[in-house]
Amino acid sequence: MTVVTRFAPSPTGFLHIGGARTALFNWLFARHHGGRFLLRIEDTDRVRSTPEAVAAIFDGLEWLGLDWDEEPTFQFARAARHAEAAHELVAKGLAYRCYCTPDELTAMREEQKAKGLPPRYNGLWRDRDPSEAPAGVAPVIRLKAPQDGETTITDSVQGAVTVANNQLDDMILLRSDGTPTYMLSVVVDDHDMGVTHVIRGDDHLTNAFRQTQLYWALGWETPVFAHIPLIHGADGAKLSKRHGALGAEAYRDMGFLPEALRNYLVRLGWAHGDDEVFTTEQAVEWFSLESIGRSPSRFDMQKLTALNGSYMRETDDDRLTALLVPRLESTLGLDIPAAGHALLRAGMAGLKERAKTLVELADLAAFYVRPRPLAIDAKAEKALDDEGRTILAALIDKLDDFSPWTRDSLENLARVMSEERGVKLGKVAQPIRAALTGSTVSPPIFEVMEILGPDETLGRLRDAQSHS
């Protein structure tokens, strides 16, 4: 058997973090078994579904590296096929037309509430003769669900879960306007797409009982269900925007690497021993449904940020530079020339050790490519007082024709200057840092001098020395 999984979002908004994890679990399971991962857009809500949301879902999945194996299926386009399945059930006596009016259904529910019963359809038209159909009333089609016994789901995560059949009413398959319901559409699409494993949030667990009964009625094999626990905030409350319930594009904009987010998401509910950091290839190799826990996972932005920092330190400098340049160009409003790319690449080793996100990296790296004269922040201004500018003037004199231009020799020069002045090295280094970076925080300043080279270094020193 070829394993086939699917991710089936509704295009009514962004690809939120819970949906991204569901997609990831489906993708990992399919890849682990050498199977297929399919994408279905459940766009039956024509009012709320938008092309922009569809594009955002595609973009989010692509950014996360979750590739799908066939052209996406759009559920609304298959409405005729869904209706066909419902009419087949009517022809077989396994579904029926219900002519209850909205007022009758309301009265039915109120009567049940008055008796302390859960409100649900009472099967009024289940066994009535079609000849009794009232004129001018468009019917719905309902499934003739089993009334006795139990329906049991053997869930790969939740275990065996059972419901008494008398707790489920005859659900609607086709509305009175002929449009299919979610329950019908999902079952028909999963069957026609050859889905073998349905991996989704455990908020769908109650749906699985009704869908199982529909599979039975249609004579189709039921897929394996795996209902995964939802994600909560770090405080244990339902995940919300304040916890980080944002779209995938928001995490990209906040400077997270897709591989770091994949690593973090797969650990929300799934474990492989004590391993915390692992490659996507390892996750594919190790992933199993049996290793998914039943308890809700807690999303912790601080842990994600720390993990992202770990990934950044291990990421190739060329790739980080390629990711950084467009971000800096957008932030600074300039085109960075090839020479600027080279500066960023040369300084990357010292920069990435101090940043946990690409946003932080951009803030740290901006001084390399800012136009002269550099803007000096308020704290750095204090290092460029009269004494600081005097130090810079002396340094400029010593740097003319200085050789070799290496971080070690430059540091030795600064040490000699500090000894001559009877001050600590930091007293000399701070005005240099302020002049070259516009800040009091940077990579090692003599490394910065080496990377900037003599011309740019001297130009910035002179700018700051004459700064008032």
UniProtKB/Swiss-Prot annotation:
EC number: 6.1.1.17
Binding site for ATP: K241
Chain ranges for the short sequence motif 'HIGH' region as given in the UniProt record: 9-19
Domain of life of the organism encoding this protein: Bacteria
Keyword annotations of the record: Aminoacyl-tRNA synthetase, ATP-binding, Cytoplasm, Ligase, Nucleotide-binding, Protein biosynthesis
Database matches in Pfam families: Anticodon_2, tRNA-synt_1c
Location within or outside the cell: Cytoplasm
Chief site of localization: cytoplasm
Alphabetical list of SUPFAM superfamilies matching this protein: An anticodon-binding domain of class I aminoacyl-tRNA synthetases, Nucleotidylyl transferase
UniProt family annotation: Belongs to the class-I aminoacyl-tRNA synthetase family. Glutamate--tRNA ligase type 1 subfamily.
Protein name: Glutamate--tRNA ligase 2
Naturally occurring in which organism (per UniProt): Rhodospirillum rubrum (strain ATCC 11170 / ATH 1.1.1 / DSM 467 / LMG 4362 / NCIMB 8255 / S1)
Gene: gltX2
